[in-house]
Each structure stands twice: as structure tokens, then as C-alpha cells.
């Protein structure tokens, strides 16, 4: 069975995603399942976020999920090796909400991206939702910096995991149909049409945007 890359647009721990999660876990059997806490590792309530996610998977999906602590760019040593050991034995890896640029800052130039690819190459499942999903492409939307801090739109280099796993030069944008802004356009992960159009012109010619709507998912069989 090939590996499976799952990209969720939002709602990763909502009732709407219970059935998809159960279906995905059927591929994994009783092999280990690991939640990666990096994207929200900067938040003071990170432990609570992890606990709620673990409870969701146990109570709603019926699966035990362990947490791999990788909240900073772990220096070589016991803590990093312990986290990597968990990742390397997992058949299901999940990362979700938080800040994509924070996650990238602590994943780049570490063995973690290779561990994600290894999971896919071992017929495992990698599930990336919301902020974590933004890191998967060749370029990443720095959503907090643009939407919250008012920085001029720019692209952050992504992990390029989609290209490395299946050859597609994709730029992943979750929350694609977001409507929280009401009359203000917050589609395309809060960028709006105008900003996304301008940013697309800065992408390499071969790149394309893979948009995933909220409470929807994209499955890429590796």
C-alpha cells in the first residue's frame, strides 16, 4: 500500500472530520500514531492544545495518539533523538494549528522533514492541517505576518514536501474558502483575492496553488 499525504483545510479536530480520520486510521492498523506539537509550540497553552487533541482522537476517533515534543529547533542530543525515535516508528504523523513560520523556523535544517518523508516511504500516513499544511509546498504563506501584523505580502520558503514525495510543484493553501471576514474578503487563508493574485505572480512559472477548503481534505497517494 502506498504512503498517503493528507492535507486538511481546517477543522482537524471538529466533528466533521471524525469519519475521515477513522477511515485514514484504517490504513494504519495498530501501528503507532504521533502528534507533532511544533506549530503551536510558542503558545503558553501548548500543553492544553496537545491534551485536547489527544482526547479528541481517543474519544471521537477511537485511537490512542502520543505527542512528540518538538517545540523548538532541538539541538542534537537526547531530547531530539527521543523525538526522532518516536517519529521514525510512527505510521501516522499529524501536525495542525499554530503558526506556519514558527513551525518552519524549528523544522528547517533538522532531520524532521526527512522523517516525514520516511513515514510516507514506509507506507505510512502524514496528516497536515491548517498551519502545518501551509508548510508543505515550495512556498508558504506567512499568514500571521501578513493578516495580523500588516507586513507586505511575501512568500516564505516551504518544506517542498509535496514535490519531494510525488513530484508536484505545489504551493498549499488551506482555509481556501474562508468566509470569516463577512463583507471583507478572507478567502485563500485570509489573503483575499487581490493579495493572492499579486503573490502568485512572484511564484516560479511551474508552481501552482493547491487550495483546500475548510473542513475538506486532499489525499495524495505516494
What are these regions (language model features)?
Residues 13-14, 100-101, 133-135, 216-218:
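Glycine-rich nucleotide phosphate-binding loop and flanking beta-alpha elements
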Residues 220-222:
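Conserved small/polar residues in nucleotide/adenosyl-binding loops
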Residues 168, 173-203, 212-214:
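A conserved mid-domain beta-alpha-beta active-site/ligand-binding segment of alpha/beta enzyme cores
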Residues 9-11, 36-39, 97-98, 131, ...:
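Active-site-proximal beta-strand/loop segments in catalytic clefts of secreted hydrolases
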Amino acid at each position: 500500500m502506498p504512503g498517503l499525504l493528507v492535507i486538511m483545510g481546517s477543522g482537524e479536530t471538529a466533528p466533521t472530520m471524525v469519519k475521515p480520520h477513522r477511515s485514514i486510521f484504517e490504513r494504519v492498523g495498530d501501528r503507532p500514531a504521533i502528534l507533532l506539537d511544533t506549530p503551536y509550540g510558542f503558545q503558553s497553552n501548548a500543553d492544553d492544545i496537545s491534551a485536547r487533541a489527544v482526547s479528541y482522537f481517543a474519544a471521537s476517533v477511537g485511537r490512542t495518539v502520543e505527542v512528540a515534543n518538538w517545540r523548538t529547533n532541538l539541538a542534537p542530543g537526547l531530547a531530539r533523538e527521543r523525538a526522532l525515535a518516536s517519529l521514525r516508528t510512527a505510521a501516522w504523523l499529524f501536525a495542525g494549528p499554530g503558526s506556519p513560520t514558527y513551525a518552519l523556523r524549528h523544522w528547517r535544517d533538522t532531520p524532521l522533514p526527512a522523517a516525514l518523508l520516511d513515514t510516507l516511504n514506509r507506507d505510512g500516513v502524514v496528516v497536515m492541517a491548517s498551519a502545518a499544511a501551509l508548510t508543505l509546498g515550495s512556498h508558504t504563506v506567512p499568514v500571521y505576518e501578513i493578516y495580523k501584523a500588516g507586513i507586505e505580502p511575501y512568500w516564505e520558503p516551504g518544506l517542498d514536501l509535496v514535490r519531494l514525495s510525488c513530484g508536484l510543484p505545489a504551493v498549499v493553501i488551506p482555509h481556501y474558502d474562508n468566509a470569516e471576514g463577512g463583507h471583507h474578503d478572507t478567502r485563500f487563508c485570509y489573503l483575499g483575492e487581490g493579495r493572492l493574485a499579486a503573490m502568485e505572480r512572484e511564484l516560479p512559472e511551474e508552481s501552482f496553488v493547491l487550495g483546500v477548503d475548510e473542513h475538506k481534505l486532499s489525499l495524495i497517494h505516494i
